UniProtKB/Swiss-Prot annotation:
It comes from the Bacteria. Belongs to the endoribonuclease YbeY family. One of its GO terms (biological process) is rRNA processing. Single strand-specific metallo-endoribonuclease involved in late-stage 70S ribosome quality control and in maturation of the 3' terminus of the 16S rRNA. The gene is ybeY. It comes from Prochlorococcus marinus (strain MIT 9313). This is Endoribonuclease YbeY. It is found in: Cytoplasm. Its cofactor is Zn(2+).
Amino acid sequence: MSALQTSPINLDLDLAFHPANDDALTSLVDADTKRRLTHASPWQQDLTAWIESVRRDPTLTCPEIVRLSPMLSLGLQLTDDATITELNHSWRQRSESTDVLSFPALDNSLVLPTDTCVELGDIVVSVQTAQRQAKQHSHELGLELRWLVSHGLLHLLGWDHPTDQSLKTMLSYQEQLLSINGKVHHH
């Protein structure tokens, strides 16, 4: 096992963030959630903390290149049901909306110089579906968005949930991630 990366990472979300384009929705939410819908900085803070948490724990699934790289990049798109339905159909052959899609870009067989920025992939979240789920679970939209983005991130890092037990483990770790920067979410 190699030495784990302990220096801060430079997570590039500024150029890869695609905000929600729903003025009607952003007028109905609190200031923090509105900021999450329109700005990369809250996501950069959360994602950096979450990735650092995963990188520090050698028992957690995380590609070696992610543990060692000082610079990481990923895309985050907040979209609507129509767009995520199109993506779900194109990539998963499912003609239905979903809450979050992840498109991992990592190739674990690559050997890159340690100063290379590693592209993790893209996370796409349907804000409309997140809003319905937040209402269903009786919590704020901002919390549901954080839940979905943390789920997408774990998929980019190689996590999956083909069994009930693996899903339970993944959801439990998501709760730990959300507690790093604030409110815990119980799904």
